[in-house]
């Protein structure tokens, strides 16, 4: 069917005639006008036609209902115009007809298809009147209309405004599918515009399809044939994508689009004036970003094609020249700068721009800046011209410009000079535009890791880096160092994988390119490290790019970009960059700075704040990267330990694990020492591309194993420092090993070359010897251990004197027997851990009977181990075997120690009162105070780090807190060990004073090892993961403190409550075996006293709470807060009974009767919905439960006495909540907030008047007892755990929504809820106590208990889920997920309670 005509057909036809009459002079004039002014791009007749076309397009885009059917004659006329143009030739005739074709902006589906075909071939051929011939010939026309296209772009964009663009966008979607030339697209649009009048309706249909086809663009762009034109296609894509956005911003974009018309051909000229438009565009980054991301998707689909286009730089450059026709020469010059000046943050454009390393770094955002600076320049004007669609045109232009810029690096340097001053202007805009782009591209990167993805990823990365770049440029502008910052700009630009590919193609010193790329990736990745999406994506593109244009060696080198803090020769220039980065992002940028020298120093200074200098020795370079990775390696420390061999290559997926990267860096450095062939070029970075892949990889794995373990085993180094008797050799060795990181690259090479083999040999020895030092320290330098082996016997004797537990002896003997079967590497480890266990048990049991026997066994074991370790030292087993054996032994002895620690926990959880009393007596308060002071001195510097350690326990984290303890001094562990020994020695009675002194002198290393081992093992336990390094040092110390507090509180409680012991909770405290009390509550007094007795000490938060978690059992995790706050005189249990007796009397006054029958418009379901909403409000405002219960009670009391309309029910709920909040809350929400939660449906006067009415109805007596008050009372009486209390609250709160429970007394409802909670928690033995304190017998409660259990069983059928969801959260112990009792089980329990 012939498509309907657009409205005002006659006008359109006249416009066609007028446009056909246009002369070449007019075209030239219009072009000139377009250059100078986008407002007037054609003659008066053309402007009129443009206006008419705009109206037509508006009608079309808006899907105006007035659409006429166009006759076939119109189609014939259009075809004739096309044929005439083709016959006249590619020159003036085509241009004239194209101008005349302004009239027909809308193309039919067939026309669009033909246009697509036209776009494909760029050969100049004549079009036939027939559509098929047009289809073929139009393909030929693409090259012909070079100048035509410019005019077309001008006129079409101007005339079409964004409406035509919408149409064009619709068309371009298909065009994009078949052709990817913006120029072709424009020419076809011109021709199709003539033809399209009859086919407008179909075009409208295609618009919808085209919108859909935005997705198609990706598939369409996949065709590599149009790579050269691809940039045009990309521009078209943005046009399509921006259609929706343009509809919104059609007015502004229309102004610019008129100037956009020639952006491909004459964009350079027309952008002079639209600088303001550029600003507007930049201010409209959402448009750019939207279609950018879409284009990126398409680009990802067609990534190879895009890369090929970039490869065909010359062809693309020539094509833009041909397409642009007259302006081709100008563009050549312009594109040189435009490549840099591509402000358009199109990810693709950026990718292309990024690829020219030298041109792109500054040019990308700098030229936009320069363009803004000097809009007079064509280049600037061009960018301003496309700025309307900066993303549309920029990618294409950028491709060509980048290519040209590659060919013309000199102007890029000039551009750089321009960029620095201008950078400040555009940086903000680009940052704004790019930020969203970054958000979108990151997921795209994840989704697509194709080689094109590099481009896209690099674009996204570049966008991120570009965001930083403008900052850098700002810095540079302020610093006025543009010339010196050019290389720095390159690293800051972080030449994306796209640049990498270009560099590869350019073959410009591929090593430098790789290094630069890796640095760029490093910087970008580091900057992106905050967003964890990018690390993986960055690594993958690096791998892809490296595979393409780089050897596997270099590829691997890039795989460890994080390890590469520096880039060979460019590291110096990079060193210049980091200052700017630091100024921009301070510590983060410092960490991210890729410079080797600066990062070493700065990273050390920063990392010293977080770790030991020993650790700095290992991670000097990665130190810069480590600050960021710290949280992540804490999170994922275990995998590195286990996968030290494998993950190191793969660690790039987790580049932020600083220790991994550091170990890898060290390994690379060591490899560089071993393999000197490839290191010459990477000497500064100490990164070898691994010339001998096999040998180097083996060495690399070994070194990685060593050094990762060393990272995790800083304790060995610490021990080395601790045992200063033998440290001299170890220090020299370690410094030789790790001073390389601090030394300059050249010095490092020389030193490493000389020492490489020796270091590897020493590392092997150290690995074999020192696996015993710590569970996580196979690499611990064993020279101190070996030298101290002679002293180990003495240390064993001293330790045996200190260890007085018979359990310790038994366990030690058993462990030693098992250890004899294992290799000597495991013996010292297990012995050390056993010694710690023995110390802990001795401290708990305090039994001195087995001192001699234990000492003998311990000494023998230590001697045997010393001999075996010496023999090991001579034999020096292979590193891999040693590591495997050490791992297996660690696992075995870890499992054994787990059982031992569990036994200790059991002992500590259930100490007899006598033993506690003895411990308290043996440990005078003076010793405790001294210990606490020492502990505080140790803990003050590591509290935050320990908290993170506890949250994320792992083998690495075990080492980390230790190192964190030694922030200020390298030998902090050495000092900590004496303090630890003091704490252990003070804990036993005075008899241990001498032993303590001996331990200070000789046993420092031994205790250190024990502590470290127990620390490593303790975190494998669920309950014991609270045993941090300091906790282990002060384990018994905390125990004693708790015991001391226990006795104080116990005596106080007993004195205060002796007269009322039967009526308060402390009756159970006097008798640990009381039947009233749960069996697990025996140690509750410590829990009760601990929170507030030690609250004045900072020791509480770090150690006291941990001790509580260890000693308290399942049902006594913590008590009710009110009971913990027993010091409050208002909550004193002496008055508790009288207070609640008063409340029980008072509740009689506020009993609610069923009132729903008296309500005209309300139902029980409405009430349930309202209460459910109130529960949600309580959680949103974080108000107390008392407020919620009181609000519901006030509402029921009011509705019992007054009528309420349906439309005022929400107002009633909000008002009652406000009244309750004023009564219960310390800081109640304001009236406006309560109106806001009602969505401002009511006026302030309405709520005030209703509040007055409610208070008057209740006689202003709102101190109403609620079930929640009684629940708290009952929980305090029976010492229920918070979990049990929370479960009872959940049961009781479920009744708030149920209308049938409003008649129940609050005290009775609370009692039934609590009894059901006890049954559900298997605490039926507490029911008699509850009956006593509540005053209700089971005979009175069993019916209500059954109803409540039925309610819980059928809660899943309820539509109202707020209560259930609330108590399903972890903050409420997920009590809602506890399965309710079956009917039969409940009956059995109730029968037992009733008849026994």
Curated annotation (Swiss-Prot):
Post-translational modification: Ubiquitinated. Ubiquitination leads to its degradation during anaphase entry, after degradation of CCNB1.
Keywords: Cell cycle, Cell division, Cyclin, Meiosis, Nucleus, Phosphoprotein, Ubl conjugation
Subcellular compartments: Nucleus
Ranges annotated as biased composition (Basic residues): 264-273
Comp. bias (Polar residues): 306-315, 780-790
Motif (D-box): 54-62
Ranges of compositional bias, category Basic and acidic residues: 10-34
GO biological process: cell division; meiotic cell cycle
Sites of Phosphoserine modification: 703
Membrane spanning stretches: none
Superkingdom, taxonomy of origin: Eukaryota
S-S pairs: none
Tissues with expression: Expressed in testis. Also expressed in the fetal ovary, but not in the adult.
Annotated segments matching region Disordered: 1-64, 259-398, 477-500, 775-796
Gene3D superfamilies registered for this protein in UniProt: Cyclin-like
Location (main, coarse): nucleus
Coiled coil: none
A Gene Ontology term for the protein's cellular component: nucleus
Family according to the record: Belongs to the cyclin family. Cyclin AB subfamily.
Purpose: Cyclins are positive regulatory subunits of the cyclin-dependent kinases (CDKs), and thereby play an essential role in the control of the cell cycle, notably via their destruction during cell division. Its tissue specificity suggest that it may be required during early meiotic prophase I.
Subunit details: Interacts with CDK2 kinase.
Comment on protein domains: The N-terminal destruction box (D-box) probably acts as a recognition signal for degradation via the ubiquitin-proteasome pathway.
Name of the protein described by the UniProt record: G2/mitotic-specific cyclin-B3
Organism (species): Mus musculus (Mouse)
Lineage of origin: Eukaryota, Metazoa, Chordata, Craniata, Vertebrata
Gene: Ccnb3
């Amino acid at each position: 069917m012939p498509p309907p005509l657009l409205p005002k057909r006659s006008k359109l036809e006249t416009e066609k005639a007028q446009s056909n009459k246009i002369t070449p002079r007019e075209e030239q004039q219009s072009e000139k006008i377009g250059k100078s002014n986008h407002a007037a791009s054609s003659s008066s007749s053309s402007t009129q036609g443009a206006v008419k076309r705009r109206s037509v397009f508006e009608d079309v885009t808006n899907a105006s209902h007035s659409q006429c059917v166009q006759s076939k004659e119109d189609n014939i006329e259009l075809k004739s115009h096309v044929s005439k143009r083709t016959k006249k030739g590619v020159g003036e005739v085509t241009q004239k007809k194209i101008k005349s074709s302004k009239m027909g902006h809308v193309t039919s589906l067939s026309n669009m298809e033909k246009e697509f075909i036209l776009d494909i071939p760029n050969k100049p051929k004549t079009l036939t009147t027939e559509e098929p011939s047009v289809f073929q010939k139009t393909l030929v026309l693409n090259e012909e209309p070079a100048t035509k296209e410019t005019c077309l772009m001008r006129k079409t964009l101007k005339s079409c405004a964004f409406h035509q663009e919408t149409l064009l966008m619709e068309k371009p979607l298909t065009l994009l599918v078949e052709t990817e030339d913006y120029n072709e697209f424009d020419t076809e649009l011109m021709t199709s515009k003539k033809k399209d009048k009859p086919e407008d309706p179909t075009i409208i249909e295609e618009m919808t399809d085209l919108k859909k086809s935005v997705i198609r663009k990706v598939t369409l762009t996949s065709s590599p044939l149009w790579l050269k034109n691809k940039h045009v296609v990309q521009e078209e894509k943005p046009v399509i994508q921006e259609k929706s956005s343009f509809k919104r911003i059609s007015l502004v974009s229309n102004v610019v689009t008129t100037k956009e018309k020639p952006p491909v051909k004459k964009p350079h000229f027309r952008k002079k004036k639209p600088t303001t438009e550029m600003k507007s565009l930049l201010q409209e980054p959402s448009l750019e970003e939207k279609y950018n991301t879409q284009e990126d998707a398409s680009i990802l689909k067609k990534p190879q094609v895009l890369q090929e286009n970039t490869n065909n730089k010359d062809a693309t450059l020539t094509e833009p020249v041909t397409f642009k026709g007259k302006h081709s020469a100008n563009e050549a010059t312009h594109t040189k700068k435009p490549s840099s000046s591509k402000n358009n943050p199109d990810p693709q454009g950026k990718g292309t721009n990024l690829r020219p390393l030298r041109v792109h770094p500054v040019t990308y955002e700098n030229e936009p800046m320069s363009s803004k600076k000097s809009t007079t320049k064509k280049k600037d004007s061009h960018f301003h011209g496309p700025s309307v669609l900066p993303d549309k045109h920029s990618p294409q232009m950028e491709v060509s410009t980048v290519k040209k810029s590659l060919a013309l690096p000199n102007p890029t340097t000039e551009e750089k000079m321009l960029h620095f001053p201008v950078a400040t202007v555009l940086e903000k805009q680009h940052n704004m535009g790019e930020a969203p782009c970054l958000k979108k591209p990151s997921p795209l990167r994840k989704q697509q890791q194709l080689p094109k993805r590099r481009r896209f990823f690099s674009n996204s990365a570049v966008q991120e880096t570009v965001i930083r770049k403008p900052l850098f440029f700002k810095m540079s502008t302020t610093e006025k160092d543009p010339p010196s910052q050019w290389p720095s700009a390159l690293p800051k630009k972080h030449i994306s994988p796209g640049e990498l590919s270009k560099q590869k193609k350019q073959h410009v010193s591929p090593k430098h390119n790789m290094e630069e790329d890796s640095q760029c990736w490093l910087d970008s990745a580091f900057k992106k490290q905050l967003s964890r999406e990018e690390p993986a994506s960055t690594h993958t593109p690096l791998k892809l790019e490296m595979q393409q244009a780089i050897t596997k060696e270099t590829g691997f080198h890039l795989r460890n970009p994080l390890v590469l803090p520096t880039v060979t020769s460019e590291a110096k220039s990079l060193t210049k960059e980091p200052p700017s980065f630091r100024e921009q992002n301070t510590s983060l940028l410092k960490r991210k700075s890729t410079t080797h020298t600066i990062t070493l120093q700065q990273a050390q200074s920063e990392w010293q704040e977080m770790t030991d200098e020993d650790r700095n020795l290992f991670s000097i370079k990665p130190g810069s990267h480590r600050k960021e990775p710290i949280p992540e390696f804490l999170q994922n420390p275990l995998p590195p330990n286990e996968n030290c061999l494998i993950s190191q290559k793969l660690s790039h997926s987790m580049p932020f694990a600083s220790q991994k990267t550091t170990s890898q860096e060290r390994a690379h450095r060591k490899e560089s020492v071993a393999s000197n062939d490839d290191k010459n070029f990477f000497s500064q970075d100490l990164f070898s591309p691994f010339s001998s892949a096999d040998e180097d990889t083996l060495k690399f794995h070994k070194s990685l194993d060593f050094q990762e373990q060393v990272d995790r085993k800083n304790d060995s180094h610490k021990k080395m420092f601790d045992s200063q008797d033998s440290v001299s050799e170890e220090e020299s060795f370690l410094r030789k090993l790790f001073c390389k990181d601090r030394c300059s690259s050249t010095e490092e090479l020389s030193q490493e070359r000389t020492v490489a083999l020796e270091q590897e040999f020493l590392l092997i020895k150290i690995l074999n010897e020192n696996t015993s030092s710590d569970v996580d320290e196979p690499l611990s330098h064993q020279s101190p251990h070996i030298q101290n082996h002679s002293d180990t016997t003495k240390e064993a004797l001293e330790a045996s004197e200190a260890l007085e537990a018979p359990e310790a002896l038994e366990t030690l003997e058993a462990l030693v027997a098992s250890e004899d079967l294992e290799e000597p590497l495991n013996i010292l480890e297990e012995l050390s851990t056993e010694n710690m266990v023995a110390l802990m048990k001795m401290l708990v049991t305090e039994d001195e009977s087995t001192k001699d026997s234990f000492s003998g066994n311990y000494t023998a074991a230590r001697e045997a181990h010393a001999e075996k370790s010496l023999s090991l030292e001579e034999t020096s087993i292979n590193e891999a075997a040693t590591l495997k054996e050490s791992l297996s032994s660690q696992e075995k002895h870890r499992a054994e120690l787990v059982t031992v620690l569990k036994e200790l926990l059991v002992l500590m959880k259930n100490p007899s009162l006598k033993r506690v009393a003895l411990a308290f007596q043996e440990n005078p308060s003076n010793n405790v105070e001294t210990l606490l002071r020492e502990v505080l001195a140790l803990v003050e510097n590591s509290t935050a780090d320990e908290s993170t350690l506890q949250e994320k326990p792992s083998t690495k984290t075990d080492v980390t807190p230790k190192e964190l303890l030694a922030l200020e001094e390298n030998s902090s562990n050495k000092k900590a060990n004496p303090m630890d020994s003091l704490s252990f020695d003070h804990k036993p009675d005075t008899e241990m004073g001498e032993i303590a002194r001996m331990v200070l002198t000789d046993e420092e290393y031994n205790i250190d090892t024990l502590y470290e081992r127990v620390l490593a093992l303790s975190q494998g336990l669920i309950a014991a993961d609270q045993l941090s390094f300091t906790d282990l040092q002060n384990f018994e110390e905390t125990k004693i403190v708790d015991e001391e507090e226990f006795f104080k509180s116990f005596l106080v409680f007993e004195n205060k409550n002796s007269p009322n012991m039967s009526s308060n909770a402390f009756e159970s405290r006097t008798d640990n075996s009381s039947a009233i009390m749960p069996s697990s509550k025996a140690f509750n007094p410590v829990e009760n006293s601990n929170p507030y007795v030690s609250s004045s000490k900072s020791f509480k938060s770090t150690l006291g709470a941990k001790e509580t978690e260890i000693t308290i059992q399942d049902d006594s995790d913590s008590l009710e807060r009110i009971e913990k706050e027993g010091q409050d005189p208002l909550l004193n249990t002496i008055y508790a009974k009288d207070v609640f007796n008063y409340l029980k009397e008072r509740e009689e006054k506020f009993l609610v009767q069923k009132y729903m029958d008296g309500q005209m418009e309300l139902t029980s379901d409405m009430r349930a919905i309202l209460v459910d909403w109130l529960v949600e409000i309580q959680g949103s405002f974080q108000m107390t439960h008392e407020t919620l219960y009181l609000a519901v009670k006030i509402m029921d009391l009011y509705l019992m006495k007054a009528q309420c309309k349906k439309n005022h029910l929400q107002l009633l709920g909000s008002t009652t909540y406000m009244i309750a909040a004023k009564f219960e809350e310390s800081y109640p929400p304001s009236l406006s907030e309560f109106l806001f939660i009602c969505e401002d449906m009511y006026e302030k006067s309405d709520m005030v008047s209703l509040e007055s009415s409610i208070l008057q109805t209740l006689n202003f007596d709102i101190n109403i007892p609620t079930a929640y008050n009684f629940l708290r009372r009952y929980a305090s009486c029976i010492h229920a755990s918070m979990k049990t209390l929370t479960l009872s609250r959940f049961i009781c709160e479920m009744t708030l929504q149920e209308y049938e429970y409003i008649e129940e007394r609050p005290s009775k409802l609370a009692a039934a809820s609590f009894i059901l909670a006890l049954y559900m928690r298997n605490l039926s033995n507490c029911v008699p106590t509850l009956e006593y304190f509540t005053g209700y017998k089971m005979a009175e409660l069993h019916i209500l208990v059954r109803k409540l259990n039925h309610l819980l069983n059928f809660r899943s059928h309820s539509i109202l889920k707020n209560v259930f969801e609330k108590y399903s959260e972890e903050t409420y112990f997920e009590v809602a997920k506890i399965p309710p009792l079956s009917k039969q089980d409940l009956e059995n329990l109730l029968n037992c309670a009733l008849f026994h």
